[in-house]
Amino acid sequence: MASPALISETEAWKDLKAHLEGIKRTHLRELMGDTERCQSMMVEFDNIFLDYSRQQASSDTINKLYKLADAAHLKQKIDRMYNGDHINSTENRSVLHVALRAPRNSAICSDGKNVVPDVWNVLDKIKDFSDRVRNGSWIGATGKKLKDVIAVGIGGSFLGPLFVHTALQTDPEASKNARGRELRFLANVDPIDVARNISGLNPESTLVVVVSKTFTTAETMLNARTLREWISSALGPSAVAKHMVAVSTNLPLVEKFGIDPINAFAFWDWVGGRYSVCSAVGVLPLSLQYGFAVVEKFLQGAHSIDQHFSSASFEKNIPVLLGLLSVWNVSFLGYPARAILPYSQALEKLAPHIQQVSMESNGKGVSIDGLPLPFESGEIDFGEPGTNGQHSFYQLIHQGRVIPCDFIGVVKSQQPVYLKGEVVNNHDELMSNFFAQPDALAYGKTPEQLKKENVSEHLIPHKTFTGNRPSISILLPTLDGYRIGQLLAIYEHRVAVQGFVWGINSFDQWGVELGKSLATQVRKQLHASRVKGEPVEGFNFSTKTLLERYLEATSDVPADPSTLLPNI
């Protein structure tokens, strides 16, 4: 008998659907009263502690989710990814970001070739180059040390490295290594982003890293040309070779741009942009800022989770458990969003990065075979560090829509503060909220409790909390390069698990193409209208009206302008 074309046609899926009604009638207050259940929903790996007992799930639910994983051939799909099979079928590519952090003596193959030696050739090149820049043996055109770096990229070439950079900034070892240096990221084509990035920097001491696999990404290359002009106007065109390097595979275009191809750092088609932070995309700028040794620990942390993900049983496998629970929340309980709530300011850029990893990967409406999905998949990811989020959007989470939450806590702060006479130290104050919020969401507060507190009758409806709002808690022992790598890999693999179960391709992103192609048409129109005075044609009434309004209001923009750079 042939396997069902869609996971929703399997008996395991139907069994979970039938099971759903009983769970909906069971409040988390009741589920949390079962100590044995709670204990079974706690998993530890390498001092990372996961507690998923506050999920709207019984032990029976979890067992049924394991059966769903089996029906989806989850283990086989994970193995196929690690074996280099072309699981990105629409682009006919392997998906091997795990190879980017594999030890030097590993063997991971794509199309019959072990790619790990190539990975380490690039890593060795990054180490050598970053060491030379940091110790002053590679200097700028005027003989000054290059102490400031601007990394130019967009999407996965920016969000992942920015997350890791922000997380490392306050780590004692990393911050010591970065003393006197600055790393900035230029992503948006908005000239304001250029202005902010070059503000306060001296071209003589600035190195620009241009990140574009093809060296044709429109936004990135316009920003790169802008920074090239910033350097050339101050130091002369020949300075570009000393002040700009590339992360790209298109060496002819790199050379044409004015960058010596020797100073181009490769990555490969089997690395998707949103999974590329462990490639030269992230490793080069991060090594320039913090030194290769710190970044290598980050890679080792990610690799430890890669091993855990590929070898641990589902019952003990943190990414698998998180992925299955997300499928349960989205496709069965019908919750469309997820809040990522790290109780560490160092993780303030985690949610924006995972937003891309998750939503670009799993924001699909058809199966890997092109069949429309008859169920909800993908989730809307957002988040903010605690306790900031508590004073922002937690109101909705507590008394509005049900939004499953990821609470992430760190046992030891990167920067502890103790004040004499305070009841608790600053980190304990933060963590008090980390421990309290999941229970507040799970248990809520009943009208009966409010009456016992003598709350006015007319206020009781406003102060009632329904509870029964699911969350998971992840407790990390510390937050250094190694643990940051682990956290990244947990979320990467969680997203893959969801896609594998839903039967979609989590590794393409055709959704970004349509808007880009329409922007090309608009770009041509703006050029024709500004340079030749041609009327706006070929657009619907609404777009035509907006374009005409924009062109009229910017009629003072010269048709053939002289170069003008931001002045800030």
Swiss-Prot record:
The active site is at 360 (proton donor), 391, 516. Pathway: Carbohydrate degradation; glycolysis; D-glyceraldehyde 3-phosphate and glycerone phosphate from D-glucose: step 2/4. InterPro entries: G6P_Isomerase, G6P_Isomerase_C, Phosphoglucose_isomerase_CS, SIS_dom_sf, SIS_PGI_1, SIS_PGI_2. It catalyses: alpha-D-glucose 6-phosphate = beta-D-fructose 6-phosphate. Keywords: Cytoplasm, Gluconeogenesis, Glycolysis, Isomerase. It is found in: Cytoplasm. GO terms for biological process: gluconeogenesis; glucose 6-phosphate metabolic process; glycolytic process. The keyword Cytoplasm applies. GO terms for molecular function: carbohydrate derivative binding; glucose-6-phosphate isomerase activity; monosaccharide binding. SUPFAM superfamilies: SIS domain. Its EC number is 5.3.1.9. The keyword Isomerase applies. GO terms for cellular component: cytosol. CDD domains: SIS_PGI_1, SIS_PGI_2. It comes from the Eukaryota. Homodimer. NCBIfam families: PRK00179.1 (NF001211). Belongs to the GPI family. This is Glucose-6-phosphate isomerase, cytosolic 1. It comes from Clarkia arcuata. The gene is PGIC1.
